[in-house]
């Protein structure tokens, strides 16, 4: 039954994978690392860092869990291939920036079971699937940031940061990828395209959307393709 499958996955995560991490690294703060896993599972695709997580433990749970310990525990989880870390990359400045990273789960089934199959946000889950597939194909994957100047409601010039879901590199190849579950509204299209419009180079820019749509290019030269097509075609980025 579905319940048995879910219980099996939860048991595997807690009593095999997580227990192995705890025993191999002689972790004393067992409750804390369990909650840390839940925090990371709840925040796939959301930039965060050990300091933010420590503040969450202090304010919401009244638990002392230091930045250094959290950082070590995240490294242990990554070494066990439970999670992967994606660094933030300043596309215009051509440099890595800040302490914030995005964390993705290697096995979404285990992640979903850990959360009792709550928090099934389609966009973040799609993003995690695309990230995993890019790693499987041998690409180096970062999270992109593009700085732009815009005007606020009062007409003042303000600096804004736009995000590109993935900056994907392999040798001299590079792709910029946005992942969007829903592109039906003009507002959503503007949000997804605006980051790509402000990248000052000619590498391929791709938007992966829900569904099985074959690749096509819009008027701006961006490639748009369905998730199913992306996953089932190993050379899908070459369109």
Language model regions located:
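A generic structural signal for residues located within well-ordered alpha-helices
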Residues: 4, 28-31, 65, 125-126, ...
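Non-catalytic, well-ordered alpha-helical scaffold segments
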Residues: 6-11, 30-37, 51, 68-71, ...
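Conserved NTP-handling cores and scaffolds of large molecular machines
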Residues: 16, 20, 40, 61, ...
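Interdomain motor-coupling "hinge/lid" segment immediately C-terminal to the ATP-binding subdomain
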Residues: 1-47
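A cross-kingdom feature that marks ATP-driven nucleic-acid transaction machinery
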Residues: 69-239
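Short, locally clustered residues in the helix-turn-helix/winged-helix DNA-binding domain
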Residues: 38-42, 58, 135
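DNA-recognition alpha helix
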Residues: 50-62
């Amino acid at each position: 039954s579905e319940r048995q499958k879910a219980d099996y996955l939860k048991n595997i995560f807690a009593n095999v994978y997580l227990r192995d991490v705890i025993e191999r690294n002689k972790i004393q703060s067992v409750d804390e690392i369990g909650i840390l896993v839940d925090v990371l599972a709840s925040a796939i695709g959301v930039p965060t860092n050990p300091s933010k997580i420590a503040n969450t433990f202090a304010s919401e749970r009244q638990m002392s869990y230091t930045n250094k310990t959290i950082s070590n525990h995240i490294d242990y989880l990554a070494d066990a291939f439970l999670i992967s870390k994606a660094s933030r990359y300043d596309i215009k400045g051509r440099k890595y920036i800040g302490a914030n990273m995005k964390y993705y789960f290697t096995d979404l089934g285990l992640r979903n079971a850990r959360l009792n199959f709550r928090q099934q946000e389609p966009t973040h889950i799609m993003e995690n699937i695309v990230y995993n597939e890019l790693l499987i194909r041998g690409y180096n994957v970062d999270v992109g940031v593009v700085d732009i100047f815009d005007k606020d409601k009062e007409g003042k010039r303000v600096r804004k940061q736009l995000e590109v879901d993935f900056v994907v590199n392999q040798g001299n190849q590079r792709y910029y990828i946005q992942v969007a579950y829903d592109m039906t509204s003009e507002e959503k299209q503007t949000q997804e395209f605006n980051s790509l419009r402000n990248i000052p180079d000619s590498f391929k820019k791709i938007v992966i959307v829900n569904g099985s749509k074959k690749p096509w290019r819009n008027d701006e030269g961006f490639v748009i393709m369905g998730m199913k097509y992306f996953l089932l075609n190993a050379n899908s980025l070459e369109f």
